[in-house]
Design a protein with these regions (language model features):
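Conserved acidic segment of CheY-like receiver
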Residues: 3-16, 20-24, 153
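Acidic catalytic/metal-coordinating carboxylates
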Residues: 38-41, 61-67, 88
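Short amphipathic alpha-helix used as the core "switch/output" element in two-component signaling
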Residues: 44, 66-78
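Active-site beta3 strand of CheY-like receiver
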Residues: 49-55
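Active-site residues of response regulator receiver
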Residues: 57, 85
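Short, flexible helix-to-coil linker/hinge segments that flank and couple to helix-turn-helix
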Residues: 91-98, 103-159, 201-202, 209-214
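Helix-turn-helix DNA-binding segment
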Residues: 146-182
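Recognition helix of helix-turn-helix DNA-binding domains
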Residues: 169-202
């Protein structure tokens, strides 16, 4: 019999956590040992439940998946983290892999693919969903990774950027990211300065040019 793989599910949406837990309940060599609604909570919970693999949502209010991945791996370098995103056009795969993530899945992945990713991660291998692997390969081939001005943005700046591009108001962004409107505006002007744009319209046009306009912000 295969060794039991202990999994922690980290996602700010309860329905997603519950759905993943139920999907994995009938897999004999995998056991969900905990659920966390935030990156901050995951840092504490990992110490308590000692998972082998963490399924990590990429975008969450507060500490996002990228920052949580970095901190968890500093806390325990043997931990295996599989990032999960709602969209295969996400701008973060390369960053998360560089941060030490063992895999990258989309939330549209079937049960078989999720199980494969968990098992490969637990076995010390890496797993990328076919869509993400293809996109990374194409970007590397075309040289887009080095050329994209968005690569200089932090994870939080990227979150704010995507929300602005999708037409969300400052107050909406503030509420979703648990930040004050003043802080959101600070991020906004910092983004403008880094990207060399003068407003939301120019930012949106730049996002379209670099293929980010269809990326889901949350």
């Amino acid at each position: 019999m295969s060794a039991l793989i202990k999994v922690l599910v980290v996602d700010d949406h309860e329905l997603v956590r519950t759905g993943i837990t139920r999907m994995l309940a009938d897999i004999p060599d995998i056991r969900v040992v905990g659920e966390s609604a935030s990156g901050e909570e995951a840092l504490s919970l990992v110490r308590q439940v000692a998972p082998d693999v963490v399924l990590m949502d990429v975008r969450m209010p507060g500490m996002g998946g990228l920052e949580a991945t970095r901190k968890l791996l500093r806390q325990n370098s043997a931990l295996r983290i599989v990032a999960v995103t709602i969209c295969d056009e996400d701008p973060f795969p390369a960053r998360l892999l560089q941060a030490g993530a063992a895999g990258y899945l989309t939330k549209g992945a079937c049960l078989e693919e999720m199980v494969r990713a968990i098992r490969q991660a637990a076995d010390g291998q890496r797993y990328l969903s076919p869509e993400v692997a293809q996109r990374l390969a194409l970007r590397a081939f075309d040289g887009d990774v080095a050329q994209s001005p968005f690569d200089q943005l932090s994870e939080r700046e990227m979150q704010v950027t995507l929300m602005i591009v999708h037409g969300e108001r400052i107050q909406d962004i503030s509420d979703k990211l648990c930040l004050s409107p003043k802080t959101v505006n600070t991020y906004r002007y910092r983004i403008f300065e880094k990207l060399g744009v003068e407003g939301d319209v120019q930012l949106a046009l730049l996002a379209v040019k670099h293929g980010l306009s269809g990326v889901n912000a949350g």
